Amino acid sequence: MRPFEDSPISRDGKVLILAYDHGLEHGPVDFEAVPATKDPEAVWDVATHDAVSAMAAQKGIAEAYYPSYSDDVNLLAKLNGTSNLWMGEPDSAVNWTVDYAADVGADAVGFTLYGGSNSEVEMAEEFRDAQEAARDHDLPVVMWSYPRGQGLKNDKNPDTIAYAARQALELGADIAKVKYPGSTDAMSHAVDMAGPTNVVMSGGSKTSDRDFLESVKGAIDAGASGLAVGRNVWQREHPAAFLDGLEAVVYEEASVDEALGRI
């Protein structure tokens, strides 16, 4: 396995992943704010911004659109995912193999694990297979480490987020994608628990420019390696301008006010 810093999805040891798996996970509701984003080409175009180190997409979106963008965008193949129509205990279907993702041209793979769900054991075993196959292809592995389940009362509790980051390390992920636990100190705890596994902040629902940049700044100051963001970029009227601001915070460690000045 090559060092993470040498991976195509890394820029100077940092990552900014543009996520676009929402059509499966959330459905059409996520495209209502900016109707143009229902067209995948509109978001692939956003992903050509220099700040974006990879775009996360499901199988069908990658098959249909990545060939036209392979020279300008690094592909993070999101291997599993389930619709919001599913009403059972949190789980996620494996929709394509690492081997097939590599054939499509993936530069990395992503996999959701719902720690605490009744499906955790099965999902961990599926992650094992994906992680080991990714090693054969020299592809970095990003774990969407999201604790969920009937017994979990607060999925943003600092100890829960730290556990999620640690779980990613223990199971062999190169990057742990976790929710921001609300403060730099709490995020630092998660980063510490992850050891050599890089931690990135999950973007979540759209917030104001300042609020989101402050969360990203808090994560970077805590030692996070970047973020994976979808709605907080492509639900904005001017996504490229907002990426200018994120680029300043993630790669240049600029202040929030400096970043706002670039938007």
Curated annotation (Swiss-Prot):
Pfam families found in the cross-reference section: DeoC
SMART domains for this protein: DeoC (SM01133)
EC number(s) reported in the record: 4.1.2.13
GO terms for biological process, alphabetical: aromatic amino acid family biosynthetic process; glycolytic process
InterPro entries the UniProt entry points to: Aldolase_TIM, DeoC/FbaB/LacD_aldolase, DeoC/FbaB_aldolase, FbaB-like
Keywords in alphabetical order: Glycolysis, Lyase, Schiff base
Enzyme class: lyase
Catalytic activity: beta-D-fructose 1,6-bisphosphate = D-glyceraldehyde 3-phosphate + dihydroxyacetone phosphate
Annotated active site: 177 (schiff-base intermediate with substrate)
GO molecular function annotations of the record: acyltransferase activity, transferring groups other than amino-acyl groups; fructose-bisphosphate aldolase activity
Function: Has aldolase activity with fructose 1,6-bisphosphate. May play a role in the biosynthesis of aromatic amino acids (AroAA).
PANTHER family, per database record: 3-HYDROXY-5-PHOSPHONOOXYPENTANE-2,4-DIONE THIOLASE, FRUCTOSE-BISPHOSPHATE ALDOLASE CLASS 1
Family: Belongs to the DeoC/FbaB aldolase family.
Protein name as it appears in the record: Fructose-bisphosphate aldolase class 1
Organism: Halobacterium salinarum (strain ATCC 700922 / JCM 11081 / NRC-1)
Species classification: Archaea, Methanobacteriati, Methanobacteriota, Stenosarchaea group, Halobacteria
